[in-house]
Amino acid sequence: MTTQRIKERGSILVYILLGVVLLGLLTIALRNAGTGGVSDIDKEQMILKAGQAQKDAAELAAAVNDLIANGVSEADLRFAHPDAPTEYGNITDNPTNQVFGKQGGKATYKSPPEGINDGSPWEFFGSSQIIQVGSDRSELIAVLPNVTESFCKGMDAQLGFDPTLQPTDNSTGSSPDCVMGTSSDRFTGTFSDASPNVLDKATFSKLPALQACVYCAADSTYNYYYVLLAR
């Protein structure tokens, strides 16, 4: 075997080994890029869904304020709908007072964006006093219950809260004990002004908090609220 052929074979072997190394590096790079891509997509989807939840809540607030402007009292506002829990009543009762009624607020009854909670519908309460909003009375709020922790933290970050400080609704042991009330707390005209649920001011890095996602210590759930009517 000539020296030239030996050199050629040696060069081929070097190229083969170099190709294997480069292929391995490319595989690692693509894998890392793929992981980052999925993460970016998930983050983008979360941002879009958080924005959709805020938009839906803002539309409800607009409907409530339209009814108030048209002379409906805050105690006469109703949130009945065929797909809503029965405690909210019948949408055909006093139709001009119904937030979702065609003769009332004309709001669209929407399901939460998919994947951000356990599928529970929007709820409506007058049992929580929101920090630095209105007076010392309870506000009328919409609540998106049982959202995921990741959605909650993402929502609060998007709203400008300190990411190291989770807004919290501490437990007092008495009812109401969370922005997400019980079935008996569903709004049908009565506000809990005498003994409202009060949030933990020290955990809110941004005030007033007309909307936020809070951790409820009473049942270890995360719930997003939006003030429909400050009082």
Each model region followed by its residue ranges:
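Membrane-proximal N-terminal amphipathic helix
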Residues: 41-72
